[in-house]
Regions:
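Helix N-cap / beta->alpha transition motif
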Residues: 52, 62-64, 104, 119
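Generic alpha-helical propensity signal that fires on short helical segments
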Residues: 44-49, 55, 69, 77, ...
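Short secondary-structure transition/capping motifs
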Residues: 6, 38, 70-74, 100
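Compact, glycine/acidic-enriched structural inserts
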Residues: 60-87
Length: 129
């Protein structure tokens, strides 16, 4: 899914994000807004980018079809994520960053309900820093 020329650049961004998340005590970050997807993946797609503080990032794609690569999974709705993670042996995050300033209230509540973190933080403010 990620072109060879972007891999090093994106790894630097992911490592910088992980450093910030670790300092905040955050387990993972879930992004879905176009500008944040483009910044973190080099592409815009309908779906989610999941970056755990430890481990590989996941590309959770709703549309378009045809994207493939390492850690790419197709989902039809966010409720598909917990069973997918359970199948892959990925722990659900206790502390999760969501794009609070950019998602609609309903989208935010839906994602919070899907992940059921003990604590949710604001990924929007995090991404701006």
């Amino acid at each position: 899914m990620i072109s060879e020329e972007l891999k090093n650049d994106l790894k630097i961004k992911w490592d910088r994000m992980r450093d910030g998340m670790a300092k905040m005590g955050i387990d993972a970050c879930l992004l879905t807004v176009d500008v944040n997807l483009y910044y973190t993946t080099g592409q815009i797609y309908s779906g989610y980018f999941y970056l755990p503080v430890d481990g590989e990032p996941w590309f959770l794609i709703k549309r378009p079809n045809g994207l493939s690569g390492h850690q790419v999974e197709y989902i039809s709705k966010p409720e598909d994520i917990p069973p997918l993670f359970a199948e892959r042996g990925i722990k659900m995050p206790k502390k999760l960053l969501l794009e609070a300033d950019e998602l609609t209230y309903n989208e935010y509540i839906r994602l919070d309900k899907v992940f059921q973190p003990e604590e949710a933080g604001n990924a929007t403010a995090f991404m701006r820093n």
